[in-house]
Amino acid sequence: PKLTQEQAEIILNKYYGVVNFIWLEGVAGLEITDMHIDGFAKFANKNSLVTMSENDLLEWQVPANDIIKLYNSKNAEGQNYKIVTLPLTQNEVTTEYGKKLGYKGSYCNYYIANNVVLVPNYNDANDAIANATIQSLYPNRKVIGIDVRNLYANGGMIHCVTLQQPK
């Protein structure tokens, strides 16, 4: 929090080799997750960025300037990312116990494990579309849809509640 963007970039470059950065403004204090990036964007590989359509991002309350930055972002080689879009749920999410949450669900918050990809599902018609799209990105892993409606009521999804440990 006390670092400038330039100082952060120097450290990230030194320890992780990052050469290109995508700085988004976000919306601090926004309900649900304060605009955590894992709810609306994920790198599938070095050339592909998984996100939502511009309209869905606006509905998700992502600032318009951040959408432009995301859609125009470049990878480490300076090439534009191939944008792969996942839908929001068709309907606002209702928990298994009937609580209406008043907002739609994102599929971007999936978790990539060694042999599987765990995808948030919401008992919604778009679950199948999201699962198939994600399966096409990870052909050597099995996509498993996990019903997250009750978890989502507390502001989290699969990626939020897992603790990744890279090999």
Predicted regions span which residues?
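Histidine/cysteine-enriched polar flanking segments
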Residues: 1-167
